[in-house]
Amino acid sequence: MTPHINAKIGDFYPQCLLCGDPLRVSYIAKNFLQDAKEITNVRNMLGFSGKYKGKGISLMGHGMGIASCTIYVTELIKTYQVKELLRIGTCGAISPKVGLKDIVMATGASTDSKTNRVRFLNHDLSATPDFELSLRAYQTAKRLGIDLKIGNVFSSDFFYSFETHAFGLMAQYNHLAIEMEAAGLYATAMELNAKALCLCSVSDHLITKEALSPKERIESFDNMITLALEMMS
């Protein structure tokens, strides 16, 4: 047990899917897993363990932003011995290469947060995912006929107050989208010798101002959930 997770040791499987929204975690448990069991609920940040095609897998919410995400990731790795962490979330596209409903695989994560500089003695850390997880995601997407969009993301500490004038520069440097956690997830996994990857479904396009309806968001997210579970099974 930790200050933020009240699961017992052994409740988490070595592979864990992460979502910012705990209700999305509950949705996955109820609609995609067999024998799903709630294992933690501190602060209503829900976690579950269950089976997908006979293989054990866990789910955990992590809240919004790098600070919240890294708390849960650290505790999952250090206390519960989770080895592979796959974040599945939403993002806002900033590149013409990406459209609504596309799934982005973050091969690197830049950030305006100072957390990684503090972690890395004020140097620039190359926050990258695990190669083997990335390869599995790519191969699984090919098998499922999913056109995975591959490139960098920008993990921002800001949801509302953001430097919109920088979108063009980010796109020039092959940043496909903006989200809020990948840079912290990758850095924490690197520090603690675990494997991590971030997949994001495009729910909004910050340049064209297009956005999915609530129904379309659910349908789009279901495709990413299937990809995530298939690559972990």
From Swiss-Prot:
Record-annotated site: Important for catalytic activity: 217
Keyword Chloroplast: no
Keyword hit for Ubl conjugation: no
Binding site for phosphate: 20, 24, 43, 87-90
Catalytic reaction(s) noted: a purine D-ribonucleoside + phosphate = a purine nucleobase + alpha-D-ribose 1-phosphate; a purine 2'-deoxy-D-ribonucleoside + phosphate = a purine nucleobase + 2-deoxy-alpha-D-ribose 1-phosphate
Enzyme class per UniProt: transferase
Residues bound to a purine D-ribonucleoside: 4, 179-181, 203-204
Entry EC no(s): 2.4.2.1
Active-site residues, Swiss-Prot/TrEMBL: 204 (proton donor)
Keywords: Glycosyltransferase, Transferase
Listed GO MF terms: purine-nucleoside phosphorylase activity
Cellular component, GO annotation: cytosol
Top-level lineage group: Bacteria
Family affiliation: Belongs to the PNP/UDP phosphorylase family.
Quaternary structure (record): Homohexamer; trimer of homodimers.
Function: Catalyzes the reversible phosphorolytic breakdown of the N-glycosidic bond in the beta-(deoxy)ribonucleoside molecules, with the formation of the corresponding free purine bases and pentose-1-phosphate.
Listed name of the protein: Purine nucleoside phosphorylase DeoD-type
Species for this entry: Helicobacter pylori (strain J99 / ATCC 700824)
Gene name, Swiss-Prot/TrEMBL: deoD
